[in-house]
């Protein structure tokens, strides 16, 4: 089944061109199937690019998915037009009465700020608490993952001496995990962050289990043994050129930045990078969506009632 998004959303045509099935409201109604309700809390400055990346992954599922785009209320986006936000987004205040089968919280370029210094931290805490009763399963990504694991488990983040930046080999630590079904023993994942969480802090909690890790970059994916929250600290959703875009952005503005590790062919920025993580990104999100489908109540309003 395809993903249901507005046909005027910029991502619509790109997804069609990429072979991702998308559907209109009319077709969705005709199928008479309850779609999985997936919310995307988009904290990234370039919201259009992030919409496409996430829609591409959740839309590849054989299940019908309805994606709702959500933003923090009162926070002005710097790189996305107000017209786009008004046309396609709702604030969390506007959707907090709803229940969602799945909920994605993205990263944000505010890693170096203490959580309490983030202007929308109080609302972020409210949203995280709300997911416990109104969301069946949550996928937290990069800063969103660090914020969530700090909020729920007190796991701190640490500033790195230099940016973790590039494509790094990771290990599958639990092949039997429902979220790693079909994963290779080793695989590559894009990394782009100034902070990290550490294994020692995560292992202090009996509720957390590390599923993916890199000998160079540390912890990548954590899940809650008895919960339905995933914490992805890197960027499996990235496009082939995402790291390149970040690199040249910093070079052109004079920001000190090293070339991304293991990314450009022959370490030559003039050569187009090859995407070596796409299949595992689809596996992870596909496994997550399938687990939601297998375990979520048929009546979406019953989500949270088993607590």
From Swiss-Prot:
GO terms for molecular function: homoserine O-acetyltransferase activity; homoserine O-succinyltransferase activity. The active site is at 142 (acyl-thioester intermediate), 235 (proton acceptor), 237. Its EC number is 2.3.1.31. The record marks 111 as: Important for acyl-CoA specificity. It is found in: Cytoplasm. InterPro entries: Class_I_gatase-like, HST_MetA, MetA_family. Pfam families: HTS. The keyword Lipoprotein does not apply. GO terms for biological process: L-methionine biosynthetic process from homoserine via O-succinyl-L-homoserine and cystathionine. Its main location: cytoplasm. Pathway: Amino-acid biosynthesis; L-methionine biosynthesis via de novo pathway; O-acetyl-L-homoserine from L-homoserine: step 1/1. Transmembrane segments: none annotated. HAMAP family: MetA_acyltransf. Belongs to the MetA family. This is Homoserine O-acetyltransferase. The gene is metAA.
């Amino acid at each position: 089944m395809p993903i249901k998004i507005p046909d005027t959303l910029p991502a619509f045509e790109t997804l069609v061109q990429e072979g991702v099935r998308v559907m209109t409201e009319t077709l969705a109604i005709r199928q008479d199937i309850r779609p999985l309700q997936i919310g995307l809390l988009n904290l990234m400055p370039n919201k259009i690019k992030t919409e496409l990346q996430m829609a591409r992954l959740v839309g590849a599922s054989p299940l019908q998915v309805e994606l709702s785009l959500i933003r923090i209320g009162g926070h002005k986006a710097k790189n996305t037009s107000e017209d786009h936000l008004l046309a396609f987004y709702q604030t969390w205040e506007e959707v907090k009465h709803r229940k969602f089968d799945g909920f994605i919280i993205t990263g944000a370029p505010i890693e170096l700020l203490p959580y309490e210094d983030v202007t929308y931290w109080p609302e972020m805490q409210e949203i995280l608490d709300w997911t416990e009763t109104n969301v069946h399963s949550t996928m937290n990504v990069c800063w969103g993952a660090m914020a969530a694991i700090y909020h729920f488990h007190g796991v701190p983040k640490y500033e790195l001496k230099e940016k973790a930046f590039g494509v790094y080999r990771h290990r599958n630590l639990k092949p039997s995990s429902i979220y790693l079904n079909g994963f290779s023993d080793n695989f590559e994942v894009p990394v782009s962050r100034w902070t990290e969480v550490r294994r020692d802090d995560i292992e202090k909690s009996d509720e957390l289990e590390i599923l993916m890790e890199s000998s160079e970059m540390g912890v990548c994916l954590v899940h809650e043994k008895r919960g339905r929250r995933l914490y992805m600290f890197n960027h499996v959703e990235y496009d082939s050129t995402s790291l390149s875009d970040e690199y040249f952005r910093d070079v052109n503005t004079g920001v000190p930045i090293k070339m991304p590790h293991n990314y450009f062919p022959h370490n030559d920025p003039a050569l187009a990078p090859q995407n070596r993580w796409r299949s595992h990104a689809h596996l992870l999100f596909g496994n997550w969506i399938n687990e939601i489908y297998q375990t979520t109540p048929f009546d979406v309003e019953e989500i949270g009632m088993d607590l």
